[in-house]
From Swiss-Prot:
The keyword DNA damage applies. InterPro entries: AddA, DNA_helicase_UvrD-like_C, DNA_helicase_UvrD/REP, P-loop_NTPase, PDDEXK-like_dom_sf, PDDEXK_AddAB-type, Restrct_endonuc-II-like, UvrD-like_ATP-bd. Its cofactor is Mg(2+). The lineage of its organism: Bacteria, Bacillati, Bacillota, Clostridia, Peptostreptococcales. Its EC number is 3.1.-.-, 5.6.2.4. Residues 485-774 form the UvrD-like helicase C-terminal domain. CDD domains: DEXQc_UvrD. It comes from Alkaliphilus metalliredigens (strain QYMF). Belongs to the helicase family. AddA subfamily. Heterodimer of AddA and AddB/RexB. Residues 2-458 form the UvrD-like helicase ATP-binding domain. ATP binds at A23, A24, A25, G26, S27, G28, K29, T30. Keywords: ATP-binding, DNA damage, DNA repair, DNA-binding, Exonuclease, Helicase, Hydrolase, Isomerase, Nuclease, Nucleotide-binding. The gene is addA. This is ATP-dependent helicase/nuclease subunit A.
Length: 1197
């Protein structure tokens, strides 16, 4: 039995309460949640299918199901009297509601579709299809608006459209539509927020906008008074400028009065603000110059705060702001009409195609659960409801859960300090409200339990994290105070290590270096310098030891023990990868960006664009200059000279017309290829066309031979996969595919480069802090800590906020001027604070990943000025004005006993009274760029020396007459013959059917087979009978696409096939060859029933595995070490508790019931499939079947 802490045991045992478990990082929340579920099953005798367990990703749901299954199996091994009950839970586990909120909504909608009149056969729309549908709906809407010529619409276009087009306004409609989907009733919310713009000066004082502005000003004025009090203290020190006291006290009095006026109407505050004046400082010649300057600077900062309020908030009077809002009201109302108009058009397009998107699922679910009878059904069905990662919920998900919970059966677990998904519209205030209002006593109907013990990290790491966040995190910044309840406490014991656990490396960007390499210094990017310094630190780390708990020994650190965490991987990850590779450090970047920037992807997309339309200069020249076109720069110039003004394709046509030379022949051949590919693109599926193009051009193999070839080929396969997804939509053709990809690029939908390494490879991982959430590593290097925060969320023309609504700029069309409305000003402040709060929580996530060591690295400029700011940063206002993570870290460290390096830079004193007792241990280093730059300089000198030797190379010095002793060796090498001639005729890749042919003596037909392309379009083919292979393909296709919850009868299956015909997935002729009765028999067979009852079913799963050629093809030499790729497609496999079951469909005719000979024929194929599946999934294939449709029978291998 596990030894649970008192708090963990309380979370496991508590009943009769809604529980909020505030689980700190590394506190074992998932283990507690699983144990609570097991105890409910054991002690409360409640079946697992009477529980609703909500997670936020499918992967998390799968992991939760596996954990629960493992825990149940572990209990069964104890051989208690509850074994039968536990066995029942194993059987029920597949139908248990362990799910995401979207999957739960799918179940609700499918069960109760009649309540909202939605097609029960709906499917989830692919991102490709829905993106294009949104674009179409928007274009139709705007075309209709232009035809309607409504004056307010044109004013809206003028105010929020671009200078030459209306794209910004279209983007705004999409932005508002997307944003309001996080509200339970989107259009109602939007209408209410638009109504806020119609108000009087009396309403203005009570508006959320003014309350937000006042709250922000309150913090600013407190900051100003703190600065003035510090300035006054310095003025009163011995040697200080006493004559400054009068002016400083005057400022303090006026600002104190201004602060008090915040409780009055905003017009009164505005009057007080405009009456503030600052007295001139009296001369103080005999004062200490340092103290005088310090006191004056502090006062100037305080004056700057007042100036900021005047210049950036109250640029006009409150009455003028009210007038602005009233003028904006009709524009915002028309924006509301555009959004609702778009919503209805988009909804109709989805309905026409029988699809829904994820937002629909949530809102359909809400609409259905608003029905009391349905809500009561779910309240009775679920004895307990569990919500994991509750801090990432939004108000829609909260409303869904609240509608099906009872008064005391909700269990919510999470950590608001790790709420880092604001960009997905997560709302941490839901967690915070409960955190602050729930009681802590046993028996409270709403009860909070804190899990504060951390079982992941060393005490030294925890002490440092606690010190930092106690200093910087607060209710105002971070949205939760870091008090004793939020602090981390060590829960696990660790063996001691020699090296310090927390290290801070500050890289100063502007340290002095030798003049002769100053230019090189400028060329070396800041990111690259940081990456190189970290690379060297990693090499040093490999000489250090950590304690391996699993093997109970000290061991050297390995690459895979180290992770580099970045706030953003864009631009940064690639620089780090290159620096690590240069230093011989194997590395892997887990990034979601950089895909479209990959040269091979950009090049191939240009080829597709040119095939679609040759009159595009940049893509055309790009393709011609590439290995596909093989034109030289000189040839491209010669072509352009023929027509300097037209398109480049015009110049090509004129060159062909005027010239008779080799370049003309080359151009004619190139254009013929483009025309040929253009014709093929019209009648070949886009995914097949892309793959054929990769093979025809040899481009796939070309990039494979480049540095990083495997990665580049994987990137091209992603494009092929994306085309396969596109092909499944109702939108077809090369033009539409290109349009979709461009839309994806324009909407920042970068897919990220392909991933070719696994988690067990011995490499240093480079990932974003977001990706690291939930993970742990022995050593964490938090890099890029000096990078400025990205607060561009506040720069848009119209801001959006869940509480404050719409925040547009005000445009005066008569004066052609604009300014921020008070709504936008309020929102800018609020969004900035919320963004900074999330940045602080992101920092918390990063610093709570390490087990043994945390290394913090950041670059900065003008460190002498920064340390002054850090030393003065002792209030919320200062921390809110931080520009980077280093500003927070530095502000805490400069006051720490180990921050002497920083204090020395500014000659600051240590506040021994306040911070001496602090026991966390930090190592602070200030590094320069000199070493990196000097190393680069020496490297370039060596390269120049090598080039010089090559330039003056003398062939005579290496004449064979002078080196006859090498003649025999040269002859041997030139006359060498390859010892494995068999390897030269073995293909690099074989399908499973090819292997069967090879072993039947048909190798020649495989080696020399040439794929042919039938160029006759389908509409010219005429009618002809389908071959047996084609009939088999159709049946496989139908089995792949059938909705498995609607296969109980011939009627249900026939309806689905008719739908496939309607959507042009198959033709009517193809549908007629499908024997529906045979398919029904399959689903009613023993193996079919098992498949339908399985938790996870996978259909038509392609694979490629590497095998030794001699193990695959009979008769090859035992000495042959050649490898080949085996590819195939597994018809179906499904998961059961104790392994995988593989099923392969066959339409072979069975003579006299002789199924054994059929099995013998396909034995090798099934063996290959099973091996591939085990290698891919890491799970055991326990059973393998052929399903023979001819005799309606499943045959086990």
């Amino acid at each position: 039995m596990k030894n649970w802490t008192t708090e963990q045991q309380a979370a496991i045992d508590a009943r009769g309460s809604n529980l909020l478990i505030s689980a700190a990082a590394g506190s074992g929340k998932t283990a507690v949640l699983v144990e609570r579920i097991i105890q409910i099953i054991l002690k409360d005798k409640i079946d697992i299918d009477r529980l609703l367990i909500v997670t936020f990703t499918n992967a998390a749901a799968g992991e939760m199901r596996e954990r629960i299954a493992g825990a149940i199996m572990e209990e069964m091994e104890r051989k208690t009297e509850q074994e039968a009950h536990l066995r029942r839970q194993i059987n029920l586990l597949n139908r248990a509601s362990i799910t995401t909120i979207h999957s739960f909504c799918i179940d609700v909608v499918r069960r109760h579709f009649h309540i909202i009149d939605v097609d029960p056969g709906f499917r989830i729309g692919d991102i490709t299809e829905t993106s294009i549908m949104r674009l179409e709906a928007l274009e139709e809407l705007f075309e209709e608006e232009y035809q309607g010529a409504h004056e307010t619409f044109f004013r809206l276009v003028e105010a929020f459209g671009g200078t030459k087009e209306d794209r910004p306004l279209q983007d705004l409609v999409l932005k508002v539509y997307g944003f309001i989907q996080s509200q339970p009733y989107p259009e109602v919310w939007l209408k209410e927020k638009v109504g806020d713009f119609s108000l009087s000066i009396e309403d203005f004082d009570e508006s959320l906008w003014i309350k937000t502005i006042k709250s922000r000003i309150e913090i600013q004025l407190k900051g100003a008074m703190d600065l003035l009090n510090n300035a006054l203290s310095i003025a009163q020190e011995p040697g200080g400028p006493e004559v400054y006291e009068e002016a400083i006290l005057s400022d303090l009095g006026q600002i104190s009065e201004l602060y008090d006026s915040l409780t009055l109407p905003i017009t009164s505050f505005y009057e007080h603000l405009n009456h503030i004046n600052h007295a001139r400082l009296k001369p103080s010649k005999e004062s200490d110059p340092v103290l005088k300057e310090e006191s004056k600077n502090l006062r100037d900062k305080a004056k700057g705060i007042i100036k900021d309020i005047k210049d950036n908030i109250f640029t006009v009077s409150p009455e003028a702001y009210v007038e602005d809002l009233n003028k904006l009201h009709p524009l915002m109302d028309y924006l509301y009409q555009l959004v609702t108009g778009f919503t209805s058009r988009y909804a109709q397009k989805k309905a026409d195609r029988g699809i829904v998107d994820f937002n629909d699922l949530e809102h359909y679910g809400l609409e259905i659960l608003a029905n009391e009878l349905v809500a009561q059904e779910y309240q009775q069905r679920f004895e307990y409801i569990f919500v994991d990662e509750y801090q990432d919920s939004n108000i829609v998900q909260e409303t869904l859960i609240q509608s099906i919970k009872r008064k005391d059966n909700l269990f919510m677990v999470g950590d608001v300090k790790q709420s880092i998904y604001r960009f997905r519209l997560a709302d941490p205030s839901l967690f915070i409200e409960k955190y602050e209002t729930f009681g802590e006593k046993e028996g409270d109907i709403n009860r909070r339990i804190d899990l504060a013990k951390n079982f992941r990290s060393r005490g030294e790491v925890l002490a440092g994290v606690n010190y930092l966040f106690k200093y910087i995190m607060s209710k105002e910044l971070g949205e939760i105070g870091y008090d004793h309840r939020a602090a981390l406490y060590q829960g696990a014991s660790f063996e001691s290590i020699k090296e310090p656990s927390i290290e801070v490396n500050l890289i100063e960007k502007n340290m002095e270096i030798d003049e002769d390499i100053e230019e090189e210094l400028q060329e070396l990017a800041d990111i690259e310098v940081e990456a190189r310094i970290i690379a060297k630190r990693i090499k040093d780390l490999l000489n250090e030891e950590i304690y391996d708990e699993k093997n109970e020994v000290y061991r050297r650190l390995e690459f895979k023990d180290i992770v580099v965490l970045l706030r953003t991987t864009k631009n940064w990850a690639q620089s780090f990868l290159e620096a690590f590779i240069r230093e011989g450090i194997p590395a892997y970047a887990d990034a979601n960006t950089g895909y479209f920037e990959a040269i091979e992807v950009g090049m191939f997309l240009n080829l597709l664009k040119v095939i679609d339309n040759k009159r595009q200069d940049i893509p055309l020249i790009s393709v011609m200059r590439s290995p596909i076109g093989e034109f030289t720069t000189a040839e491209l110039i010669d072509i352009r000279i023929n027509d300097k003004n037209g398109t480049y394709y015009d110049a090509i046509e004129k060159y062909i017309e005027k010239n008779e030379d080799a370049l003309k022949d080359k151009l004619v051949s190139f254009i013929e290829k483009l025309n040929k590919w253009g014709n093929e693109a019209r009648y070949i599926k886009i995914d097949q066309f892309i793959w054929k193009l990769l093979m025809d051009t040899g481009f796939y193999y070309y990039v494979g031979a480049m540095p990083g070839g495997l990665q580049r080929q994987a990137n091209l396969r992603i494009l092929f996969d994306r085309a396969s997804q596109f092909e499944k939509t109702s939108i077809k053709g090369l033009f539409n595919f290109i349009k979709f990809i461009e839309k994806l690029q324009g909407s920042k939908g970068d897919m990220g480069a392909a991933k070719i390494l696994g988690e067990n490879d011995n490499v240093v991982r480079i990932m974003s802090i977001h990706k690291s959430k939930g993970l742990e590593f022995p050593v964490v290097i938090a890099a890029g800590m000096g990078k400025n925060f990205n607060l561009r969320d506040t720069s848009a023309d119209v801001l959006l906020h869940k509480d404050l609504g719409l925040g547009p700029k005000f445009v005066d069309s008569n004066l052609r001027t604009y300014r921020d409305s008070i709504a936008k000003l309020a929102m800018k402040d609020q969004i900035k604070i919320e963004s900074l709060s999330e940045e602080m929580r992101i920092l918390y996530v990063a610093f709570t990943r390490p087990k043994d060591k945390l290394i913090i690295v950041g670059s900065l400029r003008k460190i002498d000025r920064l340390v002054t700011n850090w030393n003065q940063a002792d209030n919320i206002y200062s921390l809110m004005n931080a520009k980077s993570y280093l500003d927070w870290i530095g502000a805490a460290l400069i006051k720490h006993p180990h921050g002497e390096v920083l204090r020395e830079l500014g000659d600051f004193e240590f506040n021994e009274l306040k911070y001496k007792a602090e026991d966390s241990k930090w190592t602070v280093n200030i590094l320069g760029r000199q070493a990196v730059v000097l190393e680069e300089h020496e490297k370039r000198l060596k390269e120049e020396e090598y080039k010089e030797k090559l330039t003056h190379f003398n062939r005579e010095d290496f004449s064979p007459h002078r080196h006859t002793e090498h003649k025999e060796e040269i002859d041997n090498r030139l006359n060498w013959q390859y010892p494995y001639p068999q390897a030269t005729v073995i293909p690099s890749k074989l399908s499973v059917s090819d292997i069967k042919k090879a072993n039947m003596g048909e190798m020649d037909s495989i080696v020399h087979q040439i794929p042919t392309l039938v160029k006759t379009p389908k509409f010219m083919e005429g009618k002809k009978a389908l071959t047996a292979a084609e009939r088999g393909t159709i049946i496989h296709f139908v089995l792949q696409h059938l909705a498995l919850n609607q296969v109980g009868s011939e009627e249900e299956i026939s309806q689905q096939i008719d739908l496939m015909v309607a959507r042009e997935l198959i033709t009517e002729e193809e549908a007629q060859v499908v024997n529906v009765g045979k398919i029904v028999n399959y689903f009613k067979s023993e193996i079919g029933k098992r498949m339908l009852g399985a938790e996870k079913v996978y259909r038509e799963s392609p694979f490629i595995i590497e095998k030794s050629a001699k193990d695959v093809i009979h008769g090859l030499s035992e000495n042959l070490e050649e490898k080949l790729l085996v590819q195939g497609v597994i018809d179906c496999y499904f998961e059961e508790m104790d392994g995988l079951v593989l099923v392969d469909y066959k339409n072979d005719i069975v003579l006299n019931g002789d199924t054994a000979s059929i099995m013998t024929r396909y034995d090798v194929q099934l063996m290959m499939y099973a091996e591939a599946l085990e290698r891919i999934t890491g799970k055991q294939v326990k059973e393998t079947y052929l399903y023979l449709f001819d005799v309606d029978q499943g045959v086990k291998r």
